[in-house]
């Protein structure tokens, strides 16, 4: 799966919103990749480009060696989007059987039901299911065509904690077959626990791309915070080890990859007031990367693409 220089703008010329702003993204066969970003960052639009639901204004999109539309038409891609809902007045089994019949090489119905974890209520009508159960049926629909790639847009947004855990158990079982998974989420722990790789999108651009550890390291491995007490904020980014600076009110937060050197310099400058040092988390890195003063892109090495 490859996007090259993909751009998508919505609205009138000269007054539009650029939802995707020159994205370059390659996803290898068998990878599980999370798209992470704030609301409106461009995650859903990127997914729509990969599914052929929208066309880029410029740039190219290739999926499994062909156009996105052909990959979907050939039954190679399954999708679970935020909008839409399954047909209501049929049983779960009837729906999955119907969807499977529209594909050239579908997954056996019983297998799709089992993998999605809906076998226990396969003979119930869909309009009698809970919200969490309906969400799992949508997953079974995405599996029905036996796709090599499955794309999920905020798949666990309507699920409680236990239902989310069960869903990801099913997803990992699908991925272990050598299939490729791309999912968007705003749950940081979900991305960290279930993805081989995390792609952070902000304002339509990729600002970080790598493992959870890579993302954490991009904003410094430690956090040093202290009270400014009316002191100047200029030059904090020049302190030893500092890779990003956040100032909120009268308190500064420094992302640093050498907290000892940073603290020593603050002490030399007599700037230690209510100082705290802690290890950076994925959330800290995410907030730093998607702040107005975002860090430059961080990427891992090249990969075989699908």
Annotated model-derived regions:
Residues 73, 211, 235-236, 262-266:
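Hydrophobic side chains in well-ordered alpha-helices
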């Amino acid at each position: 799966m490859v996007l090259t220089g993909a751009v998508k703008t919505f609205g009138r010329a000269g007054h539009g919103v650029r939802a995707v702003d020159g994205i370059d993204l390659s996803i290898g066969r068998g990878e599980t990749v999370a798209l992470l970003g704030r609301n409106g960052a461009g995650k859903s639009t990127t997914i729509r480009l990969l599914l052929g639901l929208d066309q880029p204004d410029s740039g190219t999109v290739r999926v499994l060696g062909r156009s996105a539309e052909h990959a979907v038409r050939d039954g190679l891609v399954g999708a679970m989007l935020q909008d839409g809902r399954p047909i209501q007045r049929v049983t779960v089994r009837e729906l999955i059987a119907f969807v499977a019949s529209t594909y050239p090489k579908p997954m056996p119905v019983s297998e799709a039901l089992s993998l999605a974890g809906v076998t226990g209520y396969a003979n119930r009508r869909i309009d009698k299911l809970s919200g969490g159960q309906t969400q799992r049926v949508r997953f079974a629909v995405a599996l029905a065509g036996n796709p090599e790639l499955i794309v999920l847009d905020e798949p666990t947004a309507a699920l409680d904690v236990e239902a989310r855990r069960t869903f990801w158990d099913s997803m990992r079982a699908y991925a272990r077959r050598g299939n490729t998974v791309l999912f968007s989420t705003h749950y940081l722990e979900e991305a960290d626990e279930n993805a081989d790789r995390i792609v952070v999108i902000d304002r339509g651009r990729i600002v970080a791309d790598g493992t959870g550890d890579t993302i954490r390291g991009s904003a410094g491995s430690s956090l040093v915070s202290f009270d400014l007490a009316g002191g100047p904020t200029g030059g904090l980014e020049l302190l030893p080890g500092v890779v990003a600076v956040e100032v909120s009110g009268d308190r500064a937060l420094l992302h640093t990859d050498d907290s000892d050197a940073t603290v020593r310099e603050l002490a030399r400058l007599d700037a230690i007031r209510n100082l705290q040092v802690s290890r950076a988390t994925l959330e800290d890195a995410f907030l730093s990367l998607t702040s107005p003063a975002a860090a430059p892109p961080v990427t891992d090495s090249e990969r075989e693409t699908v």
